[in-house]
Amino acid sequence: MACALTDEISQRLGVQHFALEPARSATLCAALLAAGRYGALVAWRGREPLGFAGFSESVALYAEGAFATIQEFYVHPDWRSRGIGAALIAAATRLAQERGWTRLELCTPPLPQFQRSLDFYAREGFEVTGGRKMKWVPGS
């Protein structure tokens, strides 16, 4: 599903920002999950995954301790606006409380193409904190 997410972002923006390969992503996901460096909440219908929230824990002084970042969040287009995303956010906030995280953070893809995503997160209790997501890649 992470590949479907990055494909959708690239398609809607008209720019190829990602180059995920499904097999490599699945192997990496399994390794990160096994090492406890990544977590995932998955919404299922029988054996069919409908959506997921992938997260990692971090610590920061500004957050006053441990917190988590929802790194990837995706619901299959056929299942959007049916409560799947809200259920995933509810599960993530419960997990945050159980683990004593001081907050959950996430980034949205660029606006205006993903305004609907921003509106969804706002309805679920997230607030815009400003800034821009930036990256540095070795060798670039």
Predicted regions and their residues:
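Conserved beta-strand-loop-alpha-helix junction that forms the acyl-donor binding cleft
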Residues: 80, 103-117, 136-139
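A short, internal acetyl-CoA/4′-phosphopantetheine-binding micro-motif in the GNAT/acyltransferase core
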Residues: 73-80
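Conserved GNAT-fold acetyl-CoA-binding loop/helix
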Residues: 3-29
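Glycine-rich acyl-CoA binding loop
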Residues: 43, 81-86, 96
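Conserved acetyl-CoA-binding loop of GNAT-fold acetyltransferases
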Residues: 121-131
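Conserved beta-strand in the GNAT
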Residues: 40-42, 48-57, 69
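Conserved acyl-CoA
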Residues: 76, 87-103, 127
